Amino acid sequence: APEGLQPEYRFDKTTLKSGKEYYKPVPGVKSTFTVTSKEGKKVMITTLTREQGQNLVKLDNRVLITKATVLPEEGRCTLLSMGENKIDYILYPSKHGWKQQTIEVEEVQPIMEWKKVGSRRMVVHVEQPDYPQVHEYFLNIHYTGDVAMAFMNGYLELDHFYYGAPWTIGLKRFRSQLEKYDMNFYIRPLRKDAPYLNDLPAHAIPDFNKKGENCVFRKVEVVPEYKAIL
């Protein structure tokens, strides 16, 4: 149901064998009602919230509602969850009906160290141990600057233009390299006359009167993307 709108259903009573002519349900998994046509066909109607509808995936003749990323496979599916080892879902129809279920996998503590080298550079050492419940590790870099660049073994691997959000890097593709080398990062200072400043959200614009605020690594973290089989 769209936000701000109250869903309503109205049926032609001449076509009903049982059920009401008019329904005004509250969106959610408890909103189910049933009507039966004169031909004896029973129809169950559930009105989901907007968020539930956006998180819905159709699997064969069932629906799956989850915030996790869904990878369908034959006879099963894989759920991917960024940073959360508990994955909530609703699978319907099933023996649980519309009741929410939870899959929990063992939590993992990523292995990572980072240190600043001057005001514009830093070095990150990260390990990617194999765990059956981890699909991939992601490096999140919270920084302020104009452009950030990532190097390994002297070569530029990636760059990122600042827009106020963390720089997220999937590490699986660098697995073999990270076993040999650390990642080196460099950021170029953000200038107060940069033409795109007006396009940035207010919280992303630094205080240029404070030294170093326009060129700084603020926080670095490694987040595991958990996986579970449903």
Functional labels for PLM-detected ranges:
Residues 1-230:
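Non-catalytic C-terminal accessory domains or segments of carbohydrate-active enzymes
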